[in-house]
Amino acid sequence: MNVGVIVFPGSNCDRDVQWVTAGLLGQSTRMIWHEERDLSGLDLIVVPGGFSYGDYLRCGAIARFSPAMQATVAFAEAGGLVLGICNGFQILTEVGLLPGALVRNRDLHFRCETTPLRVERSDRPWSRTYQQGQILNLPIAHGEGRYHADPATLAALEANGQVLFRYLDNPNGSCNDIAGITNVAGNVLGMMPHPERAAEAIAGSVDGLGLFAGLLEPVAA
């Protein structure tokens, strides 16, 4: 698998993703500066966590206009795998690859903790190493992670099976306890928890490693 990790001014989880994909899983990984447009030869694009462009205006509002993200939209629309983690999830909603928005946490505080979430379906590339209903313990670190959407959008997400991960204790007040969603096709995933921070036992959990490892099988098949 050939992985591309987009790097914005203010990204701070890009190297964590690189360590998982290249260091732990041995996959070719290229860091893509936000001004680049060339995504040729890549199987997976990761839009990592951090504070792109300082979170000015609002999280992801400026990053959506970057050349790399415009190329990512085309990549996703052609069926390429795209993963947005934390700030990356916010950016994916800003560019319209995923519905809804991420807004201030219900308690107005930055939440940095490990939280349990449930796998809602295991028939997506992202969740193929998990079982439906399995509980994962993943870290969160965000101030604007509360997923919000209008009732019609929420109903569509549920009807289409687009909710992939759901909080058990909803630390931020997200609608329908949503922690991660896909697009209808399933090739784009946005999630607020950080799987790349739960990939080694020394970090306290390996529950996130399966998300990345599971992507290797469909590409190699």
UniProtKB/Swiss-Prot annotation:
PROSITE patterns: GATASE_TYPE_1 (PS51273). Residues 2-221 form the Glutamine amidotransferase type-1 domain. One of its GO terms (cellular component) is cytoplasm. Its EC number is 6.3.5.3, 3.5.1.2. Pfam families: GATase_5. Pathway: Purine metabolism; IMP biosynthesis via de novo pathway; 5-amino-1-(5-phospho-D-ribosyl)imidazole from N(2)-formyl-N(1)-(5-phospho-D-ribosyl)glycinamide: step 1/2. Coiled coil: none annotated. Gene3D superfamilies: 3.40.50.880. One of its GO terms (biological process) is 'de novo' IMP biosynthetic process. It catalyses: N(2)-formyl-N(1)-(5-phospho-beta-D-ribosyl)glycinamide + L-glutamine + ATP + H2O = 2-formamido-N(1)-(5-O-phospho-beta-D-ribosyl)acetamidine + L-glutamate + ADP + phosphate + H(+); L-glutamine + H2O = L-glutamate + NH4(+). It comes from the Bacteria. SUPFAM superfamilies: Class I glutamine amidotransferase-like (SSF52317). InterPro entries: Class_I_gatase-like, PRibForGlyAmidine_synth_PurQ. GO terms for molecular function: ATP binding; glutaminase activity; phosphoribosylformylglycinamidine synthase activity. Keywords: ATP-binding, Cytoplasm, Glutamine amidotransferase, Hydrolase, Ligase, Nucleotide-binding, Purine biosynthesis. The active site is at residues 86, 194, 196. It is found in: Cytoplasm. Part of the phosphoribosylformylglycinamidine synthase complex involved in the purines biosynthetic pathway. Catalyzes the ATP-dependent conversion of formylglycinamide ribonucleotide (FGAR) and glutamine to yield formylglycinamidine ribonucleotide (FGAM) and glutamate. The FGAM synthase complex is composed of three subunits. PurQ produces an ammonia molecule by converting glutamine to glutamate. PurL transfers the ammonia molecule to FGAR to form FGAM in an ATP-dependent manner. Part of the FGAM synthase complex composed of 1 PurL, 1 PurQ and 2 PurS subunits. NCBIfam families: FGAM_synth_I, PRK03619.1. This is Phosphoribosylformylglycinamidine synthase subunit PurQ. It comes from Synechococcus elongatus (strain ATCC 33912 / PCC 7942 / FACHB-805) (Anacystis nidulans R2). The gene is purQ.
